[in-house]
């Protein structure tokens, strides 16, 4: 899922 991936990256940042 692209949305989940983006959320993960944002959280990691």
From Swiss-Prot:
Signal peptide: none
Location relative to the cell: Secreted, Extracellular space, Apoplast
Source organism superkingdom: Eukaryota
GO molecular function: metal ion binding
Keyword S-adenosyl-L-methionine included in the entry's annotation: no
Keyword ATP-binding recorded: no
Disulfide topology: none
GO cellular component, one term: apoplast
Keyword vocabulary terms for this entry: Apoplast, Manganese, Metal-binding, Secreted
Family statement drawn from the similarity comment of this UniProt entry: Belongs to the germin family.
Function summary: May play a role in plant defense. Probably has no oxalate oxidase activity even if the active site is conserved.
Quaternary structure, from the entry: Oligomer (believed to be a pentamer but probably hexamer).
UniProt-recorded name of the protein: Germin-like protein 1
Species, as recorded: Betula pendula
């Amino acid at each position: 899922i692209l949305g989940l991936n983006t959320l993960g990256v944002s959280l990691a940042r």
